[in-house]
Amino acid sequence: MLENQNNFNKNSVLEKIESIESSYEYLDTLLYVDIPSQQMFFIKKGEIVDIYSISSSYYGTGNKVNSLMTPLGKHEIYKKLGENLPENAILKGRVWNGAIADIIKEPLDTDFDHVTSRILWLDGLEEGKNKGPGIDSRERYIYIHGTAEEGLIGKPASDGCIRMYNKDVIELFDLVDEKAQVWIY
């Protein structure tokens, strides 16, 4: 039963992606972030290779600067940062400050929003939607990154970025290249 359920979920996701753009299967790598399920699908040449739990914005989805919302639409990885850093390393201003985060496994929201382990910095690909004045994902510093608040993964809790478990973002970092597409819907 579980295998049938997984196949149904995968087929359902692939149908969603195909409705966005039918030529997705020609992309070497696609990261598809499904906001309703709080999951990211790692797709190679049209096949789902892995599924990661994520956390999008607590404030919902939207593309405006200073909204703290997760931007929708097609993006690409602009820059990868944090290669070879220790797991749970805290990055401030995209640079390791030498500190290691204490990971919170309970579903607790803290007063800090540490960016940890790795950063995949996103750039919008859709002029007027997630690229351009007042809505630019890259200028908003929208990332896929690790978090100290791992207990909140699986539900909206970020300030706009896509949060992942630290071990997962380290794994993903090594599997994707800059310019790989990231679709957030």
Regions inferred by a protein language model and the residue ranges of each:
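N-terminal pre-domains immediately preceding structured catalytic cores
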Residues: 1-185
